Amino acid sequence: MLQDSFSYTVEQFADLQILRYRVPGFENLPLRRKQLIYYLSQAALEGRDILFDQNGKYNLQIRRLLEAVYIHFKGDRTSEQFFALEVYLKRVWFANGIHHHYACDKFVPAFTSDYLEEVVNSLPEEVLPLEEGETCQAMCDKLFPVIFDPSVMPKRVNQSDGEDLVLTSAANYYEGVTQQEAEAFYAAQKKADDQEPVMYGMNSRLVKENGHVYEQVWKVGGMYSSAIEKIISWLQKAEDVAENDAQREVIRLLIEFYRTGDLKLFDAYSIAWLKDTDSLVDFVNGFIESYGDPLGMKASWESIVNFKDMEATHRTETISSNAQWFEDHSPVDARFKKTEVKGVSAKVITAAILAGDLYPSTAIGINLPNSNWIRSVHGSKSVTIGNLTDAYNKAARGNGFREEFVYSETERQLLEKYADITDDLHTDLHECLGHGSGKLLPGVDPDALKAHGSTIEEARADLFGLYYLPDAKMIELGLVPDAEAYKAEYYSYMMNGLMTQLVRIEPGCTVEEAHMRNRQLIARWALEHGQAEHVVEMVNRDGKTYVRINDYAKLRMLFGKLLAEIQRIKSEGDYEAARQLVETYAVQVDPVLHAEVLQRYRSLHLAPYKGFVNPVYTPQTDAEGNITDVHISYSEGYAEQMLRYSRDYSNL
């Protein structure tokens, strides 16, 4: 399929645009690697229901109810009410639940409860997702308040200072326990002198029954067993066609972890995965990121299957091989620097399938594992996902965004000339170096920053990248074409952090998501601290607000200063300073500027959030059932894919 004729956009609704991505190079892989990718992609798809359930305990039944309506309703499918229901279902698919994937607020249906009740009652009972012994009426009585009452489960993850974050979050990680009880439960498990602590609570739901607090572990024979068993069956097939012994061991340890739920085994798996840098095909499958837990402990299920982009990997390897130089020259207090940077193995990858918390909305860079001690002893693995970045860039060409928000032609030309390069490079620096830099002082709890941990960690990685982009070392290593290139990233970062990312927030709301908080924190802090010298200004022209950078070199010094402070906060576990920074700069929104940005954005008819449909892999078999080839196709639509996944991979 030729690049120019490839259609990157699928459809657009609500605040979402659905794209598709190409998997260049798949057709040319040898059969064994195609088989490996196919088996791993099946293992990825089998876990879909886990995330729906983690995001809220009624999500699966609500999704299935709406799907039943969407498939079987025989009445007027052209009415406004039906259209509203269709959009709502598409949003639920996208968010893996009834709360916004990014802002975490519950969706407000544009159809009425009377309409849904009428439609549901028109369906034959056998197509409804009734639980054992449940009547249609009982199901509606249970689910309708969850869908329609704004006071019921309003937020998936609540980060509001001073509230019980566990009781006020709708995510399904805790049942019947308060924040205090949850924190006490895990504090009692932690040993102060443990040099190799497991990630407590990572793979379980914490429940209180009859005054007894205990964990329901996600494993074979435990919670989510039926989905995990399916995942294992495909992983076993993958093990048979693994590229080498190291990869075989990775898969074996992962299967063992899924069977036992033993977190020591998860650490062993993480270390083995980290050390396998030779395999072309790689994958993540499991409970990984903790953004969905207000306490930052419990990990959502995700999977990605990928293979190395050899050409682009040269860039990240250059950065990684110089990691010690960057650590030594960072503007951070020597007490907080790593004396010896453990190799961050870095590569650019081509995604072959996305699943769980990486689907449809996904990351463009990943740095794992998340265990602090493993990172400091064994290093980490960092990836930039080349074909997804490429799809975003191709889909956004000529959409009018820069013309509307960028201050002048000078900045527009900077962005036109350098943005694709500096954007990728900032992601690489963030993932390869940023997360891997610095160290905690002895005895500091990695969870000391509590609810602000994610924001501070993302800011630390972003600042590391921002600080180094203008460095002469970048030109010396051949990573940027000239000394002007970094200005493109500085401009787009400040414009985004101060203004344009606000398009992702509803009027009257505050900034909640960790990555958005980090970007606003950095941009607002720099704006304020450079005020006296007019380093960066918000200027008004023809009634519109723009960001203008007057002194790029001084802006770099400000980034360095903030990096030093944020590293100190992380290294010392200074919760109060973290809270101050976040509450002062990262959370509040100027309502007047917000309204203006939303108005200007609306006129462009763009969607602030983007996600992907996956390609479809079809195995070709001989008479004996052996796979002889795997074909890839890109023609599946959004609803078509979601309904197929619900039909073929509904395991809970």
Language-model segments: residues:
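N-terminal-proximal low-complexity accessory segments that begin disordered
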Residues: 2-71
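Long, well-structured alpha-helical subdomains associated
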Residues: 22, 51, 466-569
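An active-site-proximal "capping" alpha-helix that borders the catalytic cofactor pocket
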Residues: 30, 244, 454-471
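Contiguous, non-catalytic segments that form substrate-binding/exosite surfaces or channel walls
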Residues: 87, 94-413, 419
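Short, glycine/acidic-rich hinge or "gate" loops at secondary-structure transitions
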Residues: 245-251, 266-268, 444-447, 474-491, ...
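Short alpha-helix carrying the canonical HExxH Zn2+-binding catalytic motif
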Residues: 420-433
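Post-HEXXH active-site segment of zinc metalloproteases
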Residues: 438-459
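Extended, compositionally biased alpha-helical segments that mediate assembly or anchoring
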Residues: 551, 555-652
